[in-house]
């Protein structure tokens, strides 16, 4: 292990300061069977897909989130088109595509929010700007 550089948000991305992460089944499967899955990954790499924390940076074109907002996110660094260690959740700061993040109400802990992206993948995409007020008041 080594320190990871602070990632910058690009267009349509946010940077989340992680307060909780969840172990997605793909994370332990990748570690168990190695390059039989995600063989395109370039190392060094940071695994982890599901996280929750606060937005610390927003990229251009992001209008749904502001710095300081509590969010959950589904990081897709293992996606063949992304292949980015900055998008792995097992670190202090994670880059997440804005459409794969959702507001987290104050009544929901970060630990509980971090486990939502795996069983509910449509959740972040469903919390569009038209519904974000509903998403921010109910878990």
PLM-predicted stretches and their roles:
Residues 33-34, 128:
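A generic structural signal for secondary-structure junctions
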Residues 5-22, 35-78, 100:
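Glycine-rich beta-strand-centered segment in the early N-terminal region that forms part
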Residues 40, 74-139:
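NAD(P)H dinucleotide-binding glycine-rich loop of Rossmann-like/cofactor-binding domains
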Residues 6, 30, 95-96:
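Conserved hydrophobic "DFG−1" position in protein kinase catalytic cores
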Residues 25-32:
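Cytochrome P450 core scaffold surrounding the K-helix E-X-X-R motif
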């Amino acid at each position: 292990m080594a320190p990871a550089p602070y990632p910058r948000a690009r267009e349509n991305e946010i940077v989340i300061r992680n307060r909780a992460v969840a172990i997605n089944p793909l994370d332990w499967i990748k570690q168990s069977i190695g390059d039989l899955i995600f063989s395109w990954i370039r190392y060094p790499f940071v695994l982890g897909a599901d996280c929750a924390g606060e937005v610390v940076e927003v990229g251009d074109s992001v209008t749904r989130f502001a710095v300081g907002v509590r969010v959950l996110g589904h990081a897709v660094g293992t996606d063949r088109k992304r292949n980015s260690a900055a998008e792995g959740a097992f670190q202090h700061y994670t880059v997440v595509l804005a459409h794969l993040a959702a507001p987290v109400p104050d009544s929901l802990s970060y630990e509980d929010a971090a486990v939502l992206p795996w069983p509910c993948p449509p959740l972040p995409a469903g919390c569009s700007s038209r519904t974000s007020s509903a998403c921010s008041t109910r878990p």
